[in-house]
């Protein structure tokens, strides 16, 4: 609901932000959930707000229905635009805190988690006043150090491809243990049988990448959204951390949940 999208390989139609999706049911569920991929709604199957939609609708606005007031709807959508990156940062911090190898920065990560959690639970005015860019800048150094600590556990010094354009790259069987792939563009990359253990995958774009047989155990900051946007098979080893969703194994595979959020 809150976010816009354009007609593309991920969506079959255009939708402006703040406009209800034509597939939204009265109970906020999706009327075509079981057929999203075959109908061309792949973007919906890989979207994850990290719980921000539920936080805004159920906590910040205490269950208020945006359909009853255009003004309330606009305010809720504005809060969601801030809440989503806050919850994304919380997810990354939680991933880093789950790892014993990142213990040297646990205190800093816990302080970041406390500040972000307090903001997420604040009133709408406080959330709207937050500077998302400043929040990212404050948390990113600890996340970067945590990622480096994970990468240091690799038996070999991994390559640094931070922000690299590796779209369509032929990396089948590549030894990418301990690699930095932060923000790398890996759309359509061939990563079959690649070894991605201890790799830092924060922000890596894996849409359409082939992870069949790839080993992602112990990789850091990869999310279920990233894996859902990639392709894989039964031999793809799940990655470590908090997320266990495998890459899509067929064009029809979608996340199991069919319920929508009042803000989505």
Model-predicted regions and their roles:
Residues 1-107, 112-130, 135-138, 142-152:
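Hydrophobic scaffolds flanking metal-cofactor catalytic centers in soluble metalloenzymes
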Residues 144, 152-264:
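Tandem repeat scaffolds
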């Amino acid at each position: 609901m809150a976010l816009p999208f354009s007609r593309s390989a991920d969506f079959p139609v255009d939708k402006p932000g703040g406009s209800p999706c034509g597939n939204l049911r009265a109970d906020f569920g999706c009327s075509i959930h079981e057929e999203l991929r075959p109908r061309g709604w792949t973007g919906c199957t890989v979207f994850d707000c990290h719980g921000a939609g539920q936080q805004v609708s159920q906590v910040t606005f205490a269950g208020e229905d945006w359909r009853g007031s255009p003004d309330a709807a606009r305010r809720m959508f504005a809060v969601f635009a801030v809440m989503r990156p806050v919850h994304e940062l919380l997810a990354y911090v939680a991933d880093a805190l789950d790892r014993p190898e990142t213990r040297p920065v646990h205190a800093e990560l816990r302080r970041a988690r406390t500040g972000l959690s307090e903001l997420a639970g604040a009133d709408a005015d406080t959330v709207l006043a937050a500077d998302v860019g400043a929040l990212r800048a404050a948390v990113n150094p600890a996340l970067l150090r945590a990622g480096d600590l994970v990468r240091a556990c690799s038996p070999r010094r991994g390559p640094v491809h931070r922000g690299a354009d590796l779209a369509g790259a032929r990396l089948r069987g590549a030894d990418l243990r301990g690699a930095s792939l932060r923000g790398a563009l890996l759309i359509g990359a061939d990563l079959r049988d690649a070894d991605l253990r201890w790799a830092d995958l924060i922000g890596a774009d894996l849409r359409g990448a082939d992870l069949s047989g790839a080993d992602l155990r112990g990789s850091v900051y990869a999310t279920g959204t990233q894996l859902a946007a990639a392709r894989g098979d039964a031999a793809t080893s799940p990655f470590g951390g908090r997320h266990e969703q495998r890459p899509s194994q067929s064009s029809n595979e979608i996340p199991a949940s069919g319920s929508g959020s009042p803000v989505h």
